[in-house]
């Protein structure tokens, strides 16, 4: 099974490094200016669950290397359009696209571009950062990847994929209801980003405040209301797990969006919290806490744009 991963940092770099360490046929598609450095130094992963180093197969957009059985996307939502054009030459009618993007809005975009029968679903529970090109730091002890079929023709290929990926040092699962899993994480991530970005603090610090836990729980309840109104009844066990993470005293957990804010970088506010609000508005759901969080993120983006344009 030939797998193409777009990018060698973050989720894609972590996944590819784990797969490469057990000799799965994995290729990274990267920018031209990163090819030489990655070919020279390889990809290193530092993790308490086991570190790894590989000399990866690398291609750039100028290479014509044929088609792949699977293409993995884990880009930021605002880079999705360019990501689609980068991987398009490497797809044929049998290729399955596995997106590990945040939220759910990207599914409609990918279905339009490649066809519903070629786009699977994916959920990654992973906190990593790229400290420099080719060096990935795992930030906790969670590395769970879940994929699932959204069309009956994908199921057999995903089962074949499981045979290879289950050998790697990561948690790999096949779901029989992947879109619900994506919605459950959408609820969690919207709550996590809404709380930690608005307060510019970790979950643990927010919980030390007078009304922090109340605010987090209200965010969570608003997101669950949106899911139910869109015929996506949250999975009770999964939401319990998420609620426990969101109310864990002393937790250092933050959303990656907050780390982007701290670096004065572009953020996925519209794709995650903005999309949750849009889906709520269509169903006439009131979302005062989410609206506050989104206003904060929009204000950040406006200030960032003003600073970069002067």
Where are these regions (language model features)?
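Internal alpha-helical scaffold of NAD(P)-dependent oxidoreductase catalytic cores
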Residues: 89-90, 113-118, 133-185, 190-236
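NAD(P)+-binding Rossmann beta1-loop-alpha1 motif at the extreme N-terminus of oxidoreductases
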Residues: 1-51
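Short, well-ordered alpha-helices that flank and scaffold nucleotide-derived cofactor binding pockets
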Residues: 17, 21, 85-89, 112, ...
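Rossmann-like NAD(P)(H) cofactor-binding subdomain of soluble oxidoreductases
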Residues: 52-135
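NAD(P)-dependent Rossmann-like dehydrogenase/reductase catalytic/cofactor-binding core
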Residues: 217-310
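Short alpha-helical
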Residues: 33, 78-79, 104-105, 153, ...
